[in-house]
Regions:
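Short secondary-structure junctions
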Residues: 55-56, 80, 116-117, 199-203
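ATP-grasp fold ATP-binding core
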Residues: 60-66, 75-97, 111-128
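Well-ordered, non-membrane alpha-helical segments in soluble/globular domains
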Residues: 1, 43-51, 69, 102-108, ...
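Phosphate-binding site of ATP-dependent enzymes
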Residues: 80, 103-161, 208, 212-221
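Conserved N-proximal alpha/beta basic substrate-recognition cap immediately N-terminal to
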Residues: 1-78, 89-90
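A short acidic (Asp/Glu
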Residues: 14-22, 93-96, 132-133, 216-220
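A long amphipathic alpha-helix within ATP-dependent nucleotide-binding catalytic cores
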Residues: 158-220
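Glycine-rich phosphate-binding loop of ATP-grasp-fold ATP-dependent ligases
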Residues: 62-63, 82-107, 133, 156-175
């Protein structure tokens, strides 16, 4: 039978497991392809993409890819609180919350992560109202399709805890309480275009873009 394997992300461990279960090697990505996916999964790609998504006054978000001890220290000490992320991590793992002091522990953590992953992702803190994501499917030939929304929740540490099982329409209505629906549609269309250019021909499968609805005191948006 014709099989099309569609996991939520590939890595060496999954490839090894499927191969061990007798899966045809022709259906599995090569090690070279996995290396390419690792490159495109690096958070520095999101750092580069983020400025292109600032479509109007409803959008916020800053993210920096920092590579040196001096940059890490300056970023942490210039802010009352901030978040450092390992570039190759997800689901709320590989996070380090900082409160204005670049401690020896944080310094050591940054050094170890940068040695294996090239640098550190640094972001300011926001007053989060909702966690959500837009989900897409890339066909590998340049076409990226919007598949729907995901509304999820995380713990105090930022680690993923679970999803709310709602229809796309219900999630859309929930998010539209905070921002105009056109803002969501415009972002969806922008992401389809940007993701097609970025990964449309190098990746076949699902991908998601995590987002937040944030509140700012000056306008309560």
């Amino acid at each position: 039978p014709n099989l099309d394997i569609r996991p939520w992300g590939w890595d060496v461990a999954l490839r090894k497991r499927l191969s061990g279960l007798g899966m045809d090697e022709a259906l599995l990505p090569s090690m070279e392809q996995l290396d390419g996916l690792r490159e495109y999964s690096h958070r520095s790609k999101a750092v580069s993409l983020l400025p292109e998504l600032q479509l109007n006054e409803y959008f916020c978000g800053e993210s920096y890819y920092l590579k040196t001890q001096e940059e890490w220290k300056t970023f942490v000490e210039e802010r009352e609180c901030c978040l450092l992320k390992a570039p190759l991590s997800g689901s709320g793992k590989g996070l380090n919350w900082c409160k204005g002091i670049f401690t020896p522990f944080i310094s050591g953590w940054c050094t170890r992560v940068a040695a294996s992953q090239g640098g550190i992702i640094a972001e300011p803190m926001y007053n989060k109202v909702e966690d959500f994501a837009m989900e897409f499917y890339s066909d590998g030939t340049g076409e990226v399709t919007f598949m729907g929304y995901s509304l999820f929740h995380t713990g105090k540490s930022g680690m993923y805890e679970g999803n709310r099982l709602l229809s796309n329409e219900a999630i859309w209505k929930q998010l539209s309480q905070y921002v105009p629906s056109k803002v969501l549609t415009d972002l969806e269309n922008c992401l389809k275009y940007r993701l097609s250019a970025l990964v449309g021909t190098v990746y076949k499968g699902y991908l998601g873009v995590d987002m937040m609805i944030c509140r700012f005191p000056e306008n309560e948006k």
